[in-house]
Amino acid sequence: MIEIDITKDMIGQCEAKAKDIGRLRNSITKGKGNLAGIVGEYVTHQHLKGSEWQNTYDYDLIENNKKIDVKTKRCSSKPRDNYDCSVAETSLHQDCDEYIFVRILNDLSKAWILGRMGRDAFFKKAKHMKKGQVDKSNNFKVHANCYNLTIKELNTL
């Protein structure tokens, strides 16, 4: 897990891009998480020195010819390794090769790049959860149909 302090300059660079996106179709947070999502992409792009920031409908970054979708969740504290990383069922159409998962504090002061996993490997290992279902491993109530995998099961960057 890589911890990153987020600066006002970083947020400033991401704000215009987040506004341009507007409300994404199939967004669990109805567009309220756009800035956090863009900051997640930004810090991941900065960490992956050779990556290209594409921000398409299907993926966010390209690294070594792999299309990477960055999945960001907001949080209120440092993530623990038993917390889940999720891919919403509504994102299954996305044409990417790999996922990188990020958590960002609600106040946007800190981010954690949690790990990565190839798309096919993720869905082979992930647990399918339905909206309203409570995950017994962490008592989290699922907000949308999704596939979950714990942070400790991810590959490191």
Please tell me what each predicted stretch does.
Residues 1-66, 71-157:
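Nucleic-acid endonuclease domains
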